Amino acid sequence: MTEQIRIIDAKEHVNEEVKIGAWLTDKRSSGKITFLQLRDGSAYFQGVVSKADVPEEVFSLAKELRQESSMWITGVIHQDSRSHFGYEIEVRNIELVGDSHDYPISPKEHGIEFLLDHRHLWLRSKRQFAIQQIRNEMIRATFEFFNNEGFIKMDPPILTDSAPEGTTELFETDYFDKKAYLSQSGQLYAEAGAMAYGKVFTCGPVFRAEKSKTRRHLTEFWMIEPEMAFCHQEESLKVQERYVAYLVQSVLDNCAYPLHLLDRDPEVLKQYTKLPYPRITYKQAIKMLQDAGMDVKYGDDFGSPEETYLSDQFDQPVFVLNYPKTIKPFYMLTDPEDDQQYVCADMLAPEGYGEIIGGSERETDYDTLKNAIEHAGLDLDEYEWYLDLRKYGSVPHSGFGLGLERAITWVCKLDHLREAIPFPRMINRLKP
């Protein structure tokens, strides 16, 4: 009986007859031979249908197939040195499963809004396939890294009655007889987890009602948020750089084909696996920007132009340390050497991609944290449980958050975050 395989496993079946369930992405014909470009969700390769080797009805069907028709292909696997994938199938039989009429995304160029309107179909393209393969690998590597480091996965709630970074930019919803919010971050809950289990990480969706149309913003995205008890900032920075280097190395090891489809140079990515990453302070960053003629001063937050410039100055990801209190959230630890700034850091990705990680050591003192919550204009009652963590065995602890789509955008060298998630949500995009 002919074995059913996936395209990605073709190398293990050279000169064997196999059966593959596939979709047609494109085709071309040269008289007595029809070339079928096939995909099955694991890879892409070519099917060759020769008029001399198949029944007339099979050759006629091959010539009539429409883009995105689904079928069973039976044939013999051969090596194909002309393609990067390296293999093709000599077709012996075609069984049509599902026809496709007037597929809207033809091989011609389409505008971005058209493609986003048809995102459910755009995902089938080679480029989107490659991006999602790399996204999958980075999620897999995330779990592997933190499991190896002794962390446990913790799942924070999505519906909350409080916000870790203030009540602006929140999506509000009715929750029976009260208001609830879609979570901006799982960090506060991860801190509770760290006090219980030592080292935890979260991986899930978060929501920001930011009315921003930049290439770096989505209203729904995924965050990886580790939290570590008995951990100071220096130790956290080392975990952060090891984690990012691990992600990049995992993509290099396991995603050569997707990287090729994206024309992403592996040699460039390799330099991001070298540790340690450089560090500068916020004050040094301000001076660098001012020396470059940019209109910034101490106390300003960095936007895309500033982050792009700073990250362009380094060949690796770079940490920017110790931001002023006025531009960071209330829960961070005050710098013992400068009470106007926090013990915190952002990691900026090179090639102009900007922030991919934000992290800090957390405030451990009950009264100091209580005052910070009040100073931020937040309701103490909503944070009573969070303050409890400082009443019952408070310890030094640190954590950080990596924006998954930002990291994917950098690793894949994309122009916009919208391609880094299957169905992007933006200020003007809620479907499909």
UniProtKB/Swiss-Prot annotation:
HAMAP family documented for this protein: Asn_tRNA_synth
Subcellular locations according to the entry: Cytoplasm
Keyword hit for Zinc: no
Family designation: Belongs to the class-II aminoacyl-tRNA synthetase family.
Catalytic activity: tRNA(Asn) + L-asparagine + ATP = L-asparaginyl-tRNA(Asn) + AMP + diphosphate + H(+)
Residue pairs linked by disulfide bridges in the UniProt entry: none
NCBIfam families in the cross-refs: asnS (TIGR00457), PRK03932.1 (NF003037)
Gene Ontology terms, MF aspect: asparagine-tRNA ligase activity; ATP binding; catalytic activity, acting on a protein; nucleic acid binding; transferase activity
InterPro entries documented for this protein: Aa-tRNA-synt_II, aa-tRNA-synth_II, aa-tRNA-synth_II/BPL/LPL, Asn-tRNA-ligase, Asp/Asn-tRNA-synth_IIb, NA-bd_OB-fold, NA-bd_OB_tRNA
EC number(s) recorded for this UniProt protein: 6.1.1.22
Description of how the protein assembles with itself and partners: Homodimer.
GO (cellular component) term, any one: cytoplasm
Signal peptide: none
Species in which this protein is naturally found: Lacticaseibacillus paracasei (strain ATCC 334 / BCRC 17002 / CCUG 31169 / CIP 107868 / KCTC 3260 / NRRL B-441) (Lactobacillus paracasei)
Entry-linked PROSITE patterns: AA_TRNA_LIGASE_II
Gene Ontology terms: biological process: asparaginyl-tRNA aminoacylation
Keywords attached to this entry: Aminoacyl-tRNA synthetase, ATP-binding, Cytoplasm, Ligase, Nucleotide-binding, Protein biosynthesis
UniProt-recorded name of the protein: Asparagine--tRNA ligase
Lineage: Bacteria, Bacillati, Bacillota, Bacilli, Lactobacillales
